[in-house]
Amino acid sequence: DGKIYLSHPPRSKPADILRFIREHLDWIARRARPQEAALPSPYADGSTHWLLGEPLRLRLAQDATRDIHHAGDILITAPGDEAALAAAFRRFHQQQSAAHLPAMVAVEAGRCPWVRALPPLRYRAMRRSWGNCRRDGILTLNSRLIQYPPALIAHVIIHELCHLQEHHHGAAFYALMQAVQPDWQARKASLERFRREHGVLM
């Protein structure tokens, strides 16, 4: 299970146990490495990936290109090391974001009376946020969002559109969120739950 267990005589002193551990750290590290190496790659053949909340299976084919091809419930790409496959998925998420998110933003903007024109959109992989809204009106959405169900993507879009009106997270901002998307708190919780349960990257 990847854990290292230490057994010792019942009367061992804590200081003696700690000294033993310090003296054998190199040995412990060597023992732990095989467990780390055994962890499956997230890009292994047959692994599950997500697009708009739907599960897709990855197939690594020798005659495929480096770009990811979407065919039904299968994603096809050429084999490669983990870095190359991660880069291929970043490109795929960018492409799918550009294909799907503008229409979703247009729908959600229709629920926001203060949005008179669709804001400029950008997409990029972000590790710490789902999106951001600049004061000049440019919306940037996390390209990894394209993995999530549309209702959860809509929550992030509404959040950023509300920032066009309220550039903060104060009471006025949340009042606006509540007016436009009354179930926003449930959607926010579902977003985190989906990420946690399915191991989907932020």
Regions found by a protein language model. Name each.
Residues 1-155, 164-202:
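Active-site-proximal or metal-binding-adjacent scaffold patches in catalytic folds
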Residues 160:
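Walker B catalytic acidic pair
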